Amino acid sequence: MADEATRRVVSEIPVLKTNAGPRDRELWVQRLKEEYQSLIRYVENNKNADNDWFRLESNKEGTRWFGKCWYIHDLLKYEFDIEFDIPITYPTTAPEIAVPELDGKTAKMYRGGKICLTDHFKPLWARNVPKFGLAHLMALGLGPWLAVEIPDLIQKGVIQHKEKCNQ
């Protein structure tokens, strides 16, 4: 894992107990409850730390997730749609988060706007199955990716703040 601040944030996210994916019907319902509880706690912790940076919701089955994330850079808010599907082999396989608006704008992204998490995040996820869930995916996957990629894309002029585009 990264620095002490990241460790502290992750230590405050409840770990999950149910090792179940979408194919596991009844157990999947239990896993989804744990996922929601973990996400709610993570969002509450972020709000209390004045670090609120995403919203997520899912379809009724809990297999397709979508929402928004945002990144503040030079006091400007950059907002992006996010989406991902729960793999059939979840939780053994981590979901792949897509930021469709950024598709093709960075080398650290796969076709379809899926962010690259293979080097750092996926080995960590694999060591922590089934304890890690979607809150951990956001905290250790998307969050650090945004922190590295968005300032770089802004500096290179690849993305611009919406207000600057309208002027």
Curated annotation (Swiss-Prot):
Entry GO CC: extracellular exosome
Result for mutant: residue 106 to I: In NEDSG; decreased ability to form thioester bond with UFM1; decreased protein ufmylation
PTM text: Ufmylated at Lys-122. Deufmylated by UFSP1.
Cross-link (Glycyl lysine isopeptide (Lys-Gly) (interchain with G-Cter in UFM1)): 122
This protein's UniProt keywords: Disease variant, Isopeptide bond, Ubl conjugation, Ubl conjugation pathway
GO molecular function terms noted in the UniProt entry: UFM1 conjugating enzyme activity; UFM1 transferase activity
InterPro entries referenced in this protein's UniProt entry, alphabetically: UBQ-conjugating_enzyme/RWD, Ufc1
A Pfam match: UFC1
Effect ascribed to mutating residue 116 to S: Instead of the formation of an intermediate complex with a thiol ester bond between UFC1 (E2-like enzyme) and UFM1 (substrate), a stable complex with an O-ester bond is formed
Catalytic residues of the enzyme: 116 (glycyl thioester intermediate)
Biological processes annotated in GO: brain development; protein K69-linked ufmylation; protein ufmylation; regulation of type II interferon production; response to endoplasmic reticulum stress; reticulophagy
UniProt key word Ubl conjugation: yes
SUPFAM superfamilies referenced in this protein's UniProt entry, alphabetically: UBC-like
Known function: E2-like enzyme which specifically catalyzes the second step in ufmylation. Accepts the ubiquitin-like modifier UFM1 from the E1 enzyme UBA5 and forms an intermediate with UFM1 via a thioester linkage. Ufmylation is involved in various processes, such as ribosome recycling, response to DNA damage, interferon response or reticulophagy (also called ER-phagy).
Family recorded in the similarity comment: Belongs to the ubiquitin-conjugating enzyme family. UFC1 subfamily.
Subunit structure: Interacts with UBA5 (via C-terminus). Interacts with UFL1. Interacts with UFM1. Interacts with KIRREL3.
Comment, domains: In absence of UBA5, the active site is solvated by water molecules thereby reducing its nucleophilic activity. A linker region of UBA5 is required to reduce the amount of water molecules in the vicinity of the active site and elevate its nucleophilic activity.
Disease: Neurodevelopmental disorder with spasticity and poor growth: An autosomal recessive disorder apparent soon after birth or in early infancy. NEDSG is characterized by axial hypotonia, delayed psychomotor development, poor feeding, failure to thrive, peripheral spasticity with hyperreflexia, poor overall growth, and microcephaly in most patients. Additional variable features include contractures, facial dysmorphisms, and ocular movement abnormalities.
Full protein name: Ubiquitin-fold modifier-conjugating enzyme 1
Organism field: Homo sapiens (Human)
Lineage: Eukaryota, Metazoa, Chordata, Craniata, Vertebrata
Gene: UFC1
